[in-house]
Design a protein with these regions (language model features):
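Short, Φ-rich (hydrophobic/aromatic) sequence segments
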Residues: 106, 225-228
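A short, charged helix-loop
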Residues: 196-214
Length: 234
């Protein structure tokens, strides 16, 4: 992202370091669910968490050798987590990790957007109240028309922002899904209850019917909602 066009709080969501931190959380969520069922030795998750340090330069160096970002990430974690790292990624495919972490990032970014729209809508409401008796020339067909108030004009903006907020929140809900169902989405290697518990810990729902990835119509709907909302703020 280009820093001068991005708010610091949004840049932080999409920083590589944050992405990798979420990758670790996604891995640990599944491992914790397995640990609670006795499939992994007790204390494994906390030992991994306490030992692991996100080292982006080291991961990139490994990736340059193995040409695979997830393998590079897991190798980086294993360098500090040691033998416990063997319990990570069991039964998962790369997209289980990447798409689920992306869903977490989208929800974080969505909270920033929603807060800003609320702030902008409140500013419009305040401005509308201030100018509810401020007369101005209305426009129709590109020419002067009957008089209105500036407050009315601003209220139209506020209402449009409200509809945009509804669209955005609906689209964000549609993206609040992840998966641990494996390469073909068949849960061949992890129990569905483990997927449910891991995703619940991350604040997500399971993709009801999946293949290798979370289906992209979810992301397309979000981008469309953002594009329409962008029109409202121009």
């Amino acid at each position: 992202m280009i820093d001068r066009y991005c708010r610091p709080e949004m840049a932080a969501v999409w920083a590589d370091e944050r992405r990798l931190a979420l990758w670790l959380e996604v891995e640990l969520a599944a491992t914790r669910a397995r640990e609670s069922r006795g499939e992994v030795p007790a204390g494994t998750v906390e030992r991994i968490r306490s030992c692991t340090r996100i080292d982006l330069p080291r991961m990139l160096a490994i990736e340059a050798e193995v040409h695979h970002d997830v393998i590079a990430f897991l190798s980086m974690v294993a360098e500090t987590a040691g033998d416990d790292a063997r319990h990570l990624h069991t039964g998962m495919t790369s997209s289980d990790l990447v798409d689920t972490a992306l869903a977490c990032q989208i929800q974080e970014a969505g909270r920033v957007l929603v807060a800003e729209i609320h702030r902008l809508r409140h500013a419009c409401w305040t401005l509308a109240q201030k100018h509810k008796h401020t007369a101005m020339v209305g426009r129709s067909h590109g020419v002067h028309a009957e008089p209105i108030t500036f407050g009315l004009k601003v209220l139209i903006w506020s209402e449009e922002l409200g509809r945009g907020l509804d669209r955005l929140q609906t689209a964000l809900m549609g993206c609040a899904v992840g998966k641990y169902s494996g390469a073909m989405g068949t849960l061949a290697h992890l129990d569905a209850a483990i997927e449910d518990d891991a995703l619940e810990a991350l604040g997500l729902e399971p993709e009801p019917i999946a293949n290798q990835v979370v289906q992209r119509d979810r992301h397309a709907a979000l981008l469309c909602a953002i594009a329409v909302d962008r029109k409202s703020t121009r």
